Structures are given as C-alpha cells and as structure tokens.
Amino acid sequence: MLVHPEAMSVGALADKIRKIENWPQKGILFHDITPVLQSAEYFRLLVDLLVYRYMDQKIDIVAGLDARGFIIGAALAYQLNVGFVPIRKKGKLPFETVSQSYALEYGEAAVEIHTDAVKPGSRVLLVDDLVATGGTMLAGLELIRKLGGEIVEAAAILEFTDLQGGKNIRASGAPLFTLLQNEGCMKG
C-alpha cells in the first residue's frame, strides 16, 4: 500500500536526517540518512515519494550506486515492478564489467556495471542517496550510456548545491531530481 506523499511533507524527511559534525573528517557536516531508513514510516515515505514521481514514466530498470543507492533503488524498483542493477565499486562484481573512473579530492576511484546489465534502448533511472560533487553519479550515468541505456533521470534524496554536483550532472545532459537541497556539507 502506497502512502500518498501529501500525507507527510518532504520537510519531515529533512528533519529525520541526522547531522554529525567533523565526520568523516574535521570540517565536514555529515548528513546521515540511516534514521530515515530505520523508520518504517519515513522509509516508506521516501520510497513512495519516488514511486509517485516515476510510476508513469515507463522505467525499464532502476540502477543504484554503491552503497546507499542499493537500498533506495532496490525498494523503488520493487514498487515500480522493474529490475534493479547495482553499480559497484571496482572489483566487487563477479561477471564481465565495464568500468568508469572519477576524480576524488585526493586521487581517483572507479565504479563498474555488468556488461549485460542494461540492454540498448532501456529506459534507466539512476538512484543514489545524495549528490555532492556529482562524480559518482556522473560515472554511473556514463556506464549506463556505454551500455546503450537511455537516462530517464538521476535521482537522490539530497543535493549539496554549493558543491556544484547537480549543475555538473545537468551539464552532462542528464536530468536530475532531488527531494531536498542543502547549501552544503562543510562545517563553518
């Protein structure tokens, strides 16, 4: 049973996100979504808000980014009655993969997807928990494109607007939807 999104406000989700100062390093204000996931009421609200947005958009598959994108994406795929594809950190998938690297503050990382995960022409929704610089989301979008998928939208719970990730994603040609926007994760 879906909870109608108007039954609770999106602001209620924002209130449920825990803020932790100086984690994982000094100067960062970490936004922890686990309280949303731990609450049946708020987790349902989160998923239902996304279901209502995408239920009429003819999604073929939901892809989720490692790791919290798995939780949200799998629940959303289930409700939309479509398959789920994990996009994992490099070296975590057992079958043949396609890889895409992205820049970190100090260095580089990569994500991978199975080569048979997205069929050419499939309409794909990419999901993660948040958008900061956009590097991971951009890498995921590129993987979907490499396999011939059509990006319906990239979606997240939270976007840190001052870090320009959303702007970078939109500049890549992908639409982006976030439930919440915040000025940033830098403590100051």
Curated annotation (Swiss-Prot):
Signal peptide: none annotated. PROSITE patterns: PUR_PYR_PR_TRANSFER (PS00103). GO terms for cellular component: cytoplasm. One of its GO terms (biological process) is purine ribonucleoside salvage. It is found in: Cytoplasm. It comes from Neisseria gonorrhoeae (strain ATCC 700825 / FA 1090). Homodimer. Pathway: Purine metabolism; AMP biosynthesis via salvage pathway; AMP from adenine: step 1/1. Belongs to the purine/pyrimidine phosphoribosyltransferase family. GO terms for molecular function: adenine binding; adenine phosphoribosyltransferase activity; AMP binding. This is Adenine phosphoribosyltransferase. CDD domains: PRTases_typeI (cd06223). It catalyses: AMP + diphosphate = 5-phospho-alpha-D-ribose 1-diphosphate + adenine. InterPro entries: Ade_phspho_trans, PRibTrfase_dom, PRTase-like, UPRTase/APRTase. Its EC number is 2.4.2.7. Catalyzes a salvage reaction resulting in the formation of AMP, that is energically less costly than de novo synthesis. Keywords: Cytoplasm, Glycosyltransferase, Purine salvage, Transferase.
